[in-house]
A protein has these predicted regions:
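Carbohydrate-associated surface elements
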Residues: 42, 149, 168
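Short acidic/histidine- and often glycine-rich active-site loop of Leloir-type glycosyltransferases
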Residues: 287-293
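Acidic anion/phosphate-binding donor-loop and adjacent secondary structure
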Residues: 125, 152-155, 166-184
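N-terminal strand-loop element at the rim of the active site
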Residues: 2, 7-15, 22-73, 81-82, ...
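Nucleotide-activated donor-binding/catalytic signature segment of Leloir-type glycosyltransferases, i.e.
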Residues: 225-247
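Conserved donor-binding/catalytic core segment of Leloir-type glycosyltransferases
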Residues: 178-207, 216
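Acidic donor-binding loop of glycosyltransferase active sites
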Residues: 253-267, 280-281
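Membrane-proximal helix-turn-helix segments that form the acceptor-binding/catalytic region
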Residues: 121-143, 150, 156-157
Length: 293
């Protein structure tokens, strides 16, 4: 049995692809008998008993997204204290050069370290670190990329060798045989609101569909209110806000189509994988990250 520390740079109480991977991996490792703990920022109560919170996050712009990082000194001190106290056999750092807990752990070098690189596109901190301090990535004992696009970005700025291991999901959670799609004509969109996610494009296309079609939008974030006001006249649209994982799985089981209309910068389509696991027909943009699925 190993004591495994899994560190997330992103707030674990805010939904996101990296966060879901971190928590899901910890659950699976614990089922295998390992003592896995997750360290990361939390904006509220930790989502699992095995999570050690490292303080609140700060919204930070990256790759057309707003990501919840914790680059402040207090988070660094909590990270140092937690790693010292836990005496992990191995550390698994997700986005190891993202400002915050993962960089702190990388600099401490208190255990063998695996780094998993998720991002694709254009990430500001890669460019900054490449100018003199990219050597910190050499502290990693192994490097993983979740897709060829993530590998390309990391290698471009950091060099090194990477093993590609695609993201996974806990597929049994998405099997809902007791729910029937029936005659549903509902299109389902789920994800935080960012322009690159293509929700505005989906709404423009939806206006052209027949009156008996529905659109379920599970999304929140800055800018969603403007879209909601613009399409307030269309009563076929249900604005659900942020929903729980349980409700997401229910709607994936009921919808006629799951739509992932992202415009760019998708490293891997976890949400597409979830929809497929639930048996939902998927319409997605022709992006490399989605084709990996």
């Amino acid at each position: 049995m190993l004591r495994i520390g899994i560190i997330s740079p992103y707030s674990l109480t805010i939904p996101g692809g990296v966060q879901s991977q971190v928590l899901g991996l910890a659950r699976e490792l614990r089922k295998m008998g390992h003592e896995a703990r997750v360290l990361g920022p939390c904006d509220g109560p930790p989502p699992e008993p095995f999570v050690t919170p490292l303080g609140n996050s700060l919204p930070t712009a990256a790759n057309g997204s707003i990501v919840p990082l914790a680059p402040d000194p207090s988070a660094a001190l909590r990270t140092i204290r937690a790693i010292n106290d836990e005496a992990f056999d191995v550390l698994h750092l997700h986005e190891p050069i993202a400002p915050g807990p993962t960089v702190t752990a990388l600099l401490l070098r208190l255990a063998p370290m695996i780094g998993t690189f998720h991002a694709a596109g254009d990430i500001a901190w890669y460019g900054r670190l490449s100018k003199g301090v990219n050597w910190i990535a050499d502290f990693l004992d192994a490097r993983i990329a979740v897709s060829p696009q993530a590998q390309e970005l990391a290698h471009r700025y950091l060099g090194g060798e990477y093993e590609i291991l695609f993201n996974g999901i806990e597929s049994d959670l998405y099997l809902r045989p007791e729910i029937s799609r029936g005659e549903s004509k509902a299109i389902f969109f789920c994800g935080r609101y960012e322009p690159r996610k293509g929700l505005a494009t989906l709404l423009e296309a939806f206006e052209k569909l027949s009156d008996d079609t529905e659109l379920w939008i599970a999304s929140d974030g800055e800018g969603i209110a403007d879209l909601k006001a613009k399409y307030a006249h269309d009563h076929r649209i249900s604005w659900l806000g942020r929903i729980t994982d349980a409700e997401k799985i229910d709607r994936l089981a009921k919808c006629a189509v799951f739509c992932a209309p992202s415009l760019h910068s998708e490293s891997f389509g976890i949400v597409v994988l979830e929809a497929m696991a639930a048996g939902a027909p998927v319409v997605a943009s022709s992006l490399e990250g989605y084709r990996n699925v």
